[in-house]
Amino acid sequence: MNTDALIAHARARFDHVAARRVLKEKYEARMLFAHAGGMWRAGPELQCTLLACAQDKDVVLLDLYETPVRVNVPELFAKAHSHWQEQMNAWLVEYDEQSKKR
C-alpha cells in the first residue's frame, strides 16, 4: 500500500469511530423522558430499580435531578421499557447502516 492509500484508510477508520461516538451520544440523549413530573433515563438501571419495587404500586424515587417524585411503578416501568426498546431498535438500525458503509 502506498502512503495515500494508508492515509485514506486511516481517515475512513477515524470517520467510522467518530460516527459511532456521535451515534451513541445521540441515542443516549434520546433515552431521557418525562413522567409524573420527573425526568428519567430509560435503561437497565431504572428498570431494575422498578422491578425491585414491583410489590408496591406507588413509590417515591429520585429522578435525574435528585428530585423526589411519587410514581406509579407499573406505569413508569411500562413507559421506561417501551422507550428503551424503541430507542435501542432505532440505534441498532442506524448502527447497521453505518457498518455497511464501512
Stretches with model-predicted labels:
Residues 1-102:
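A preference for well-ordered globular domain cores
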